[in-house]
Amino acid sequence: MSEGSEDTKTKLDSAGELSDVDNENCSSSGSGGGSSSGDTKRTCVDCGTIRTPLWRGGPAGPKSLCNACGIKSRKKRQAALGMRSEEKKKNRKSNCNNDLNLDHRNAKKYKINIVDDGKIDIDDDPKICNNKRSSSSSSNKGVSKFLDLGFKVPVMKRSAVEKKRLWRKLGEEERAAVLLMALSCSSVYA
């Protein structure tokens, strides 16, 4: 009985040092060593663990590393290749902002007149716009300037009753689209 217990101790001690094939824990056919194919035990090549929720591929082959060692191995490999996720993120952010950077001094200016009957008159003469810019802000009632785009847009304010009436007319898909657009424009915080 002491021989059997010594045998299992040596197998347990050597589990972290040797691979599954050396420990005879793997069986390619159902008759190898009296163990079924469901009893195969994997050990991590780096740390020797046998319990992990996810096995990852490593230098020793597929599913040879535990989750933690697989992540470490991937990070080391990426660092060796010169691929850093931080640099990628910075590049992505800078590329996104380059599209919206406009030179406001060279942007074409438009003058928008709102006529009483609801029509909008657009004048693209820059001299008129520059003269009107020096006037007081009270003349710009109902017009909002979008600085990022360099032009003026009329702002129409609706009463609460009109908003509710319009909201009722919209279907479920249209309401969802309006809410998504509001979230993407950062006008509503979730």
Swiss-Prot record:
Looking at the keywords, is DNA-binding present? yes
Q: Does the keyword Metal-binding apply?
A: yes
Query: Taxonomically, what lineage is the organism?
Result: Eukaryota, Viridiplantae, Streptophyta, Embryophyta, Tracheophyta
State the Gene Ontology terms under molecular function: DNA-binding transcription factor activity; transcription cis-regulatory region binding; zinc ion binding
Q: What is this protein called?
A: GATA transcription factor 17
- Give the record's family classification: Belongs to the type IV zinc-finger family. Class B subfamily.
Q: Which InterPro entries match?
A: Znf_GATA, Znf_NHR/GATA
User: Per the record, what is one GO cellular component?
Assistant: nucleus
| Pfam families per UniProt | GATA (PF00320)
Gene3D superfamilies the record matches: Erythroid Transcription Factor GATA-1, subunit A
In residue numbers, the zinc fingers (GATA-type) are: 38-92
Which residue ranges does the record annotate as region Disordered?
1-42, 77-101
What is the protein's major site of localization? nucleus
Biased amino acid composition, Basic and acidic residues: 1-14
Which UniProt keyword terms apply here? DNA-binding, Metal-binding, Nucleus, Transcription, Transcription regulation, Zinc, Zinc-finger
| Physiological role | Transcriptional regulator that specifically binds 5'-GATA-3' or 5'-GAT-3' motifs within gene promoters.
Q: What does the UniProt entry say about where the protein is found?
A: Nucleus
